[in-house]
């Protein structure tokens, strides 16, 4: 299973479409800023499972069903998804990691900083920020799952995945 992770699109639809066309993911995750970009992408690719959370720039543009945190299994792996602003990820990652561990997540996904990051902690928790796919930064994350385990977790910063 391939999961495409996007964040901080800030109305940059072209790169997101390119990623979806190239990767052909089974699942798309959009981590906020801008929520309506995610909704538009979901409408363009309705056959692909889609999850998204709201970011700090989405305060006045999100529907009532929008969430700031989603915790759920995908492919047998437990995901903790948030934009990150409520965890103050520009200063520290410890609050995000604490909440992800309390939720018994296998991987924590966040955005907000526009800086790509992907590491596996000593206790096995994966932590990923795909960077910004907006502002011509061209950064995205790709997670691969086989047999209910993460087999690959990587960032691509070259405007294609």
Question: Which residues fall in each region the model found?
Answer:
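A short helix->loop->beta-strand "cap" motif at the edges of active sites that frequently abuts
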Residues: 46-49, 124-125
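N-terminal active-site segment of His-dependent metallophosphoesterases
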Residues: 1-47, 58, 62-67, 138-139, ...
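Active-site neighborhood of phospho(di)ester-bond hydrolases with catalytic His/Asp-centered motifs
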Residues: 5-7, 27-33, 51-56, 80-83, ...
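Binuclear metal-dependent phosphoesterase catalytic core
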Residues: 15, 74-75, 101-104, 121-122, ...
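Helix-adjacent hinge/juxtasegments
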Residues: 49-90
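Pre-active-site segment of Zn-dependent metallo-hydrolases
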Residues: 15-19, 81, 87-100
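Charged helix-capping and loop-helix junction motifs
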Residues: 65-69, 91-99, 125
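Active-site environment of divalent metal-dependent phosphoester hydrolases
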Residues: 10-14, 35-39, 57-62, 87-92, ...
């Amino acid at each position: 299973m391939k999961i495409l992770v996007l964040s901080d699109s800030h109305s940059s639809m072209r790169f997101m479409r390119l990623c979806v066309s190239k990767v052909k993911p089974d699942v798309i995750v959009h981590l906020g800023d801008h929520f309506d970009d995610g909704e538009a992408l979901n409408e363009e690719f309705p056959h692909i499972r889609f999850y998204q959370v709201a970011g700090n720039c989405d305060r006045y543009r999100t529907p009532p069903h929008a969430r700031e945190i989603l915790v759920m299994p995908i492919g047998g792996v437990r995901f903790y998804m948030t934009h990150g602003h409520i965890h103050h990820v520009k200063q520290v990652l410890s609050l995000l990691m604490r909440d992800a561990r309390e939720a018994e997540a296998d991987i924590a996904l966040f955005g907000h900083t526009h800086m790509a990051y992907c590491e596996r902690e000593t206790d096995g928790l994966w932590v990923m920020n795909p960077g910004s796919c907006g502002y011509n930064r061209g950064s995205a994350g790709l997670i691969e799952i086989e047999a209910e385990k993460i087999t690959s977790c990587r960032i691509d910063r070259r405007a294609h995945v």
